[in-house]
Every structure is written in structure tokens, then in C-alpha cells.
């Protein structure tokens, strides 16, 4: 009897321990499955030292975990500017938040399948610059070309800020290697109805845009190689054409604070607006200061443009930063000097 009682006590203890483990696991899962929300507000004063304008961008986001393997993401943007005219007649657009007034636009609405720790797949509405051209060094700079090389964005009406498109995206990520590939509707949009609505997918009318990229990481340095193929109507002519392009850029860490940046993009079609883009720069981090210098060259519409950006991002808190920027842009025979003061709040 004593041995039977002992066995019963042991079984009861194991059951209680198992229940406790399951309850703890359930609590952990409930925490991990809680939705998360984000807010990013960017305010920018721009001046060409003759007149000034004010641009504001509000981005809202939410992520809902449907299970441990499936999630749903939503994001939107709203933009307001005091003047829709450009301060400079530059070809690349010196500010990556420069846009017309947009009361509300849906930028992300995707279902993601987290296949395992390395593989994921999503389908839905998204911008390509959410996944491409968004590395740490490039993201410091405000020039639009650092968020999407003009060998793509100046040639094809694809889904880059502020427009989005329906697409599918696959990603593979491990410690030193990341591979991604995407297929999008060929024309980006932000409206909810009509010919240019964001829910539209029409390869015959809008074309298709396929792209992929490989990233190699080594000792905090990053090396990227990518290619894309656009099949649809080009910006400047109402006819179907194929527009292949390649790009490469590297972020070489020299010291814990200093990184060198080199970028190149090439489009192969002889009739393209922009065939080549190249840039060199550096970033340096000291305490809460991020310094950056980037200079690039491109040729668009048979016009040469050199653009140089000098910037310093001051991280005041984990949520607030201030970033003064100076742009010196030489477009053909015209030189513009643009000053920018950017405020960013991220919650």
C-alpha cells in the first residue's frame, strides 16, 4: 500500500507539473500572440534659402499574430505639405518623404506565413522599399535614390513610396546569408477605387514586376546583389516593353563606428530614362550622433546630375530624433543648395 501511495503521489506531482508547464507555455504563447502597434511621424522643414516649405508624414502600423506561424500586417500613410511645388528642379528628388497631399493611403496589408525560423512567405499589398534598399547605412540618408535606385524608379511605375501594389514575397534568412524574391503588379497605386486602385492586379494593363536580392553578411559588413525585370508600360511611352536591371551595393565596416558605402545600378534597355546610377559615401556613429556623407551620379532624360548629401542624425531619446541635412545638387548647368531639418517620432 505504501508503495502504491508513493506511486500515486509521484503521478499526481507529474500531472501537476505538466499542467503547470502547459499553463506557462500558454501564457508565453498568449504574450507572443498579442497584437503590436506602431506610429512614425516625420516632419520636415525644407528651404532653398529663397523660400521654405513644410512636409509632414504620418505612418501607422499594426501586426496581428493569428497563430505562431501566421500573422497579418497593416500599415497606412497620410501626408500633408504646405506647397506641392518642388524647391529644386532635381531629377532624383532630394527628400524621400516629398509627396503631394494624401489624406490616407493603405501601404501594407499582407498575410505572412512564417514557415520556420529561416523561411517566410507573404501575400498582399506592400511597397518594394519595405524590403529592398532599406539597409542601415542607406536608411540614414534622405535622398530618394537611397530608398530605390533610379535605374528602377525613374524607368518603371512600380510600387515605391508613396504607392503600393499587390504582390507575393519570399524570404530566406540565416546568420550570414539572406535571399529574397518578389513578384508584384507592375503599377503602384494608392487609391481605393478607379483605374489606379491599390487592390488591382492586371498584368495585361499594369504589367508585372519581378525582383530578387542576395545579401551576404560578414563581421558587421553587408554586401547586396540584386536584379529585376519589369514587363509593362514605361513611364514615358504607352507601349509594352521589358526593362531588366541589376544593382549592387556594399556597406563595409572599417571600425565599430565607421562604415563605407558604395552603390551601383544599371538598366539594360537602350531606350530607358535612366541607365546608370553610382554612389559613394560613409557613415560614422559617435554616441547618439549618426553622421553621413553620400555623393551620387546619374543621368536621366539625357541630363547629368550630381547630388551630395551631408547629414547628422541626433538621437535625443529612443523615440525622438532630429536630423539636419544639407543637399548640394548639380543638375545639368544648374546648382541648388537645399537645407532640411527633419524631426522623427517613432513609437
Region locations from a protein language model:
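Outer-envelope beta-barrel architecture signal
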Residues: 27-37, 66-72, 117-121, 166, ...
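Solvent-exposed loop/turn segments connecting transmembrane beta-strands
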Residues: 47-52, 128, 160, 204-206, ...
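Transmembrane beta-strand segments of Gram-negative outer membrane beta-barrel proteins
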Residues: 26-48, 72-74, 143-144, 150, ...
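Detector for outer-membrane/organellar transmembrane beta-barrel domains
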Residues: 68-69, 176-182, 215-300
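Outer-membrane beta-barrel "beta-signal"
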Residues: 335-347
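Outer membrane beta-barrel
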Residues: 55-186, 276-279, 290-296, 300
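Residue-level signature of outer-membrane beta-barrel architecture
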Residues: 26, 62-66, 112-113, 125, ...
Amino acid at each position: 500500500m505504501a508503495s502504491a501511495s508513493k506511486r500515486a503521489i509521484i503521478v499526481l506531482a507529474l500531472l501537476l507539473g505538466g499542467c503547470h508547464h502547459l499553463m506557462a507555455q500558454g501564457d508565453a504563447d498568449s504574450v507572443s500572440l498579442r497584437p503590436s502597434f506602431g506610429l512614425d511621424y516625420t516632419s520636415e522643414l525644407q528651404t532653398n534659402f529663397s523660400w521654405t516649405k513644410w512636409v509632414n508624414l504620418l505612418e501607422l502600423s499594426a501586426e496581428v499574430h493569428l497563430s505562431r506561424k501566421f500573422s497579418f500586417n497593416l500599415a497606412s500613410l497620410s501626408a500633408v505639405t504646405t506647397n506641392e511645388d518642388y524647391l529644386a528642379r532635381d531629377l532624383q528628388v532630394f527628400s524621400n518623404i516629398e509627396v503631394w497631399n494624401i489624406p490616407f493611403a493603405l501601404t501594407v496589408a499582407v498575410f505572412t506565413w512564417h514557415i520556420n525560423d529561416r523561411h517566410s512567405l507573404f501575400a498582399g499589398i506592400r511597397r518594394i522599399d519595405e524590403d529592398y534598399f532599406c539597409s542601415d547605412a542607406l536608411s540614414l540618408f534622405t535622398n530618394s535614390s537611397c530608398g530605390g535606385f533610379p535605374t528602377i524608379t525613374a524607368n518603371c511605375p512600380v510600387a515605391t513610396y508613396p504607392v503600393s501594389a499587390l504582390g507575393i514575397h519570399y524570404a530566406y534568412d540565416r546568420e550570414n546569408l539572406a535571399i529574397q524574391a518578389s513578384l508584384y503588379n507592375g503599377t503602384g497605386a494608392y487609391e481605393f477605387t478607379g483605374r489606379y486602385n491599390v487592390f488591382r492586379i492586371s498584368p495585361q494593363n499594369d504589367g508585372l514586376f519581378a525582383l530578387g536580392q542576395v545579401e551576404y553578411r560578414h563581421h558587421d559588413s553587408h554586401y547586396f546583389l540584386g536584379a529585376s525585370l519589369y514587363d509593362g508600360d514605361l513611364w514615358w511611352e504607352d507601349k509594352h516593353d521589358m526593362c531588366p536591371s541589376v544593382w549592387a551595393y556594399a556597406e563595409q565596416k572599417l571600425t565599430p563606428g565607421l562604415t563605407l558605402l558604395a552603390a551601383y545600378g544599371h538598366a539594360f534597355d537602350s531606350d530607358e530614362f535612366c541607365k546608370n546610377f553610382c554612389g559613394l559615401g560613409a557613415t560614422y556613429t559617435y554616441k547618439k550622433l549618426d553622421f553621413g556623407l553620400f555623393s551620387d551620379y546619374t543621368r536621366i532624360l539625357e541630363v547629368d546630375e550630381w547630388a551630395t548629401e551631408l547629414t547628422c542624425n541626433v538621437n535625443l531619446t529612443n523615440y525622438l530624433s532630429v536630423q539636419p541635412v544639407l543637399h548640394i545638387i548639380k543638375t545639368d548647368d544648374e546648382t541648388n543648395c537645399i537645407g532640411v531639418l527633419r524631426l522623427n517620432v517613432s513609437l
